């Protein structure tokens, strides 16, 4: 398992309590995952940190409603994180949750398609399939790579995306779920 410094664990526990509190009024995570929140959500998000070589970067997290993985990665040391979320209620939650981190977090309350931004790494979790993700981010410049938390249909998503897009990828096994994969995508280009 991952070794996590005590001060980060304490901040992640505060974040966990905040998500559970807000989840009662706005649906941030599935109710049937609340009992296993640390494993299912915190560690699932935190495992991405091992694929981020330099934490002094700008990371963009799309569909960030619950702050997973964006806020978790900020708490773990990523210097600058932008969270893109269209739902204003979830942005209010993200604003409160962002105070837990010592790093720079920007909340962008817009549809992803309308956001113009540059970043080193783009993340998302429980958002959509690869084709939809790639189509949504037409105005986002990703210099280094994508770190995408995917489920059991990841191979089908790759095959379908390869019909419209050129990209390199690595598949990493999730440490939290046998079906889960981390898809590391680079050099994304749309086919003509």
Swiss-Prot record:
Q: What is its EC number?
A: 2.1.1.170
Quote the record's binding site residues for S-adenosyl-L-methionine: 63, 68, 112-113, 125
What is the predominant subcellular site recorded for this chain?
Answer: cytoplasm
Q: Would I find Hydrolase among this entry's keywords?
A: no
| Pfam annotation, one family | GidB
Gene Ontology molecular function terms on file: rRNA (guanine-N7-)-methyltransferase activity
Q: Which GO terms describe its cellular component?
A: cytosol
Q: Which reaction does it catalyse?
A: guanosine(527) in 16S rRNA + S-adenosyl-L-methionine = N(7)-methylguanosine(527) in 16S rRNA + S-adenosyl-L-homocysteine
Q: Which InterPro entries match?
A: rRNA_ssu_MeTfrase_G, SAM-dependent_MTases_sf
Q: Which UniProt keywords apply?
A: Cytoplasm, Methyltransferase, rRNA processing, S-adenosyl-L-methionine, Transferase
Q: Where in the cell is it found?
A: Cytoplasm
Q: Does the keyword Protein transport apply?
A: no
Q: Supply the source organism for this entry.
A: Rickettsia africae (strain ESF-5)
Matching entries from HAMAP family are given as: 16SrRNA_methyltr_G
Q: Which family does it belong to?
A: Belongs to the methyltransferase superfamily. RNA methyltransferase RsmG family.
Q: What does this protein do?
A: Specifically methylates the N7 position of guanine in position 527 of 16S rRNA.
Q: Quote the Gene3D superfamilies the UniProt record gives.
A: Vaccinia Virus protein VP39
Domain of life the protein comes from: Bacteria
Can you name this protein? Ribosomal RNA small subunit methyltransferase G
């Amino acid at each position: 398992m991952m070794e996590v410094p005590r001060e980060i664990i304490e901040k992640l526990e505060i974040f966990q309590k905040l998500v559970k509190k807000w989840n009662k009024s706005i649906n941030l995570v599935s109710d049937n995952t609340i009992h296993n929140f640390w494993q299912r959500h915190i560690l699932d998000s935190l495992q991405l940190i091992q694929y981020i070589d330099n934490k002094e970067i700008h990371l963009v997290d799309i569909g960030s409603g619950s702050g997973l993985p964006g806020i978790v990665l900020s708490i773990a040391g990523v210097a600058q994180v932008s969270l893109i979320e269209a739902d204003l209620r979830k942005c209010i939650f993200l604003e409160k949750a962002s105070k837990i981190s010592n790093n720079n977090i920007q909340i962008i309350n817009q549809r992803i398609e309308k956001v113009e931004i540059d970043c080193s790494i783009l993340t998302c979790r429980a958002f959509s399939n690869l084709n939809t993700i790639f189509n949504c981010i037409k105005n986002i410049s990703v210099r280094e790579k994508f770190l995408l938390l995917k489920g059991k249909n990841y191979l089908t998503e790759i095959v379908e995306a390869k019909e419209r897009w050129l990209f390199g990828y690595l598949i990493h096994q999730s440490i939290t779920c046998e079906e889960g994969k981390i898809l590391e995508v680079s050099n994304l280009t749309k086919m003509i």
